[in-house]
Swiss-Prot record:
Organism superkingdom: Eukaryota
Name of the protein described by the UniProt record: Chalcone synthase A
GO molecular-function terms, A-Z: naringenin-chalcone synthase activity
UniProt cross-references to InterPro entries, sorted A to Z: Chalcone/stilbene_synt_C (IPR012328), Chalcone/stilbene_synt_N (IPR001099), Chalcone/stilbene_synthase_AS (IPR018088), Polyketide_synthase_type-III (IPR011141), Thiolase-like (IPR016039)
UniProt lineage: Eukaryota, Viridiplantae, Streptophyta, Embryophyta, Tracheophyta
Underlying gene: CHSA
Organism, as annotated: Ipomoea trifida
Reaction catalysed by this enzyme: (E)-4-coumaroyl-CoA + 3 malonyl-CoA + 3 H(+) = 2',4,4',6'-tetrahydroxychalcone + 3 CO2 + 4 CoA
GO biological process, one term: polyketide biosynthetic process
Catalytic residue list: 168
Length: 362
């Protein structure tokens, strides 16, 4: 199950937690190409030469309509798919084609978000001491972290860490990891980049594998970056959030509910119908462990940066915890405008939260 990270907005009038890591800047980026979810079933079945599967197409249309996703940004275009027809069939050996695209494009999309975060941070790029790069899109050596180091012109001595194949739990896991790095390395300024492109999951429909239709409906492409450090310098750095504590929990006997496997046909996707219920039934135990040390037990009194794995998950958790509609609004908005961005999703929601907070202050 996904990890949780407790995050607190920095407020000069509130009690300070000395020595905790601070989120100093956020940047996000998406491909310029985007698809309208309402018309995507027509495009998908046409580009995969599957228009004769009328019942399957109508089923996919119902899935898209229920997703509460309005649009998604995708690197995949009609031209790219026509050039690489092996991406459009369900079981074609296409891993080489997918890898060639991802190895090139994932670092580039990550660079766009990183440059925005660095610009907001306002400090010289030479002050970045650590780089953590995360993606579920493609595997290569030297990795995307190395490629991004070159693209940005980072110091050759920057301390790098590459995280592959962490899926949807990676966003909160990155917050936990970067908190430890920033707090245990004096003067560290950590650049975190999550860059996701869904080419590995795209393929034509299968009459035997319904999970494939959910994958084609749900995921979008995007990258997010943040700068994190401890003890921000007054007048030079502006903290946005404070990372107070983090925790991670495995729910027993759930490893079969959500599985992705890298095969010759790309990354296959299996999601049990039980996932929304399992998450809803176990989320409160995680919250109690995370917030009890701070005397917090009212889940409507805190702000939420909740990874929206899908609309059903958001609905079930909201209902189970008795949350007001505004608590998960940022998560719903990001899901609607971008789809499920896997590792980048939580950072997109953090960005949405800080924009909302700034707007409310005005």
């Amino acid at each position: 199950m996904s990890p949780t990270a407790t995050v607190q907005l920095t407020d000069d009038t509130a009690k300070r937690f000395e020595g905790h890591a601070k989120l100093l800047a956020i940047g996000t980026a998406t491909p310029t190409n985007w698809v309208d979810q309402a018309t995507y079933p027509d495009f998908y079945f046409r580009i995969t030469n599957s228009e004769h599967l009328l019942e399957h197409k109508e089923k996919f249309r119902r899935i898209c309509n229920k997703s509460k996703i309005r649009k998604r940004h995708l690197v995949l275009t009609k031209e790219l798919l026509k050039k690489n027809p092996n991406l459009c069939t369900y079981n074609d050996a296409s891993l080489n084609t997918r890898q060639d695209i991802l190895v090139s494009e994932v670092p580039k999309l990550g660079k766009e978000a990183a440059m925005k975060a660095i610009k907001e941070w306002g400090r010289p790029i030479s002050e970045i001491t650590h780089l953590v790069f995360c993606t579920t899109s493609g595997v290569d050596m030297p990795g995307a972290d190395f490629q991004l180091t070159k693209l940005l012109g980072l110091n050759s001595s920057v301390k790098r860490l590459m995280m592959y194949q962490q899926g949807c739990n990676a966003g909160a896991a990155m917050l936990r990891l970067v908190k430890d790095l920033a707090e245990n390395n004096k003067g560290a300024r950590v650049l975190v980049v999550c860059s996701e492109i869904t080419i590995n999951i795209f393929r034509g429909p299968s009459l035997e594998q319904d999970d494939n239709l959910l994958a084609q409906c749900l995921f979008g492409d995007g990258s997010a970056a943040m700068i994190v450090g401890k003890d921000p310098r007054p007048g030079l750095e502006t903290p946005l959030f404070e990372l107070v504590s983090s925790a991670q929990t495995i729910v027993p006997n759930t490893d079969s509910h959500l599985k992705l496997h890298l095969r010759e046909m790309g990354l296959t996707f299996h999601c049990s119908r039980a996932v929304p219920s399992v998450l809803a039934e176990n989320v409160e135990d995680c919250l109690v462990k995370a917030f009890e040390p701070y005397g917090i037990s009212d889940w409507n009194s805190i702000f939420w940066v909740f990874h929206p794995g899908g609309n059903a998950i958001v609905d079930r958790v909201e209902e189970r915890l008795g949350l007001g509609p505004e608590r998960l609004r940022a998560s719903r908005d990001v899901l609607s405008e971008y789809g499920n961005l896997t590792s980048a999703c939580v950072l997109f929601i953090l960005d949405e939260m800080r924009k909302k907070s700034k707007k409310d202050e005005q």
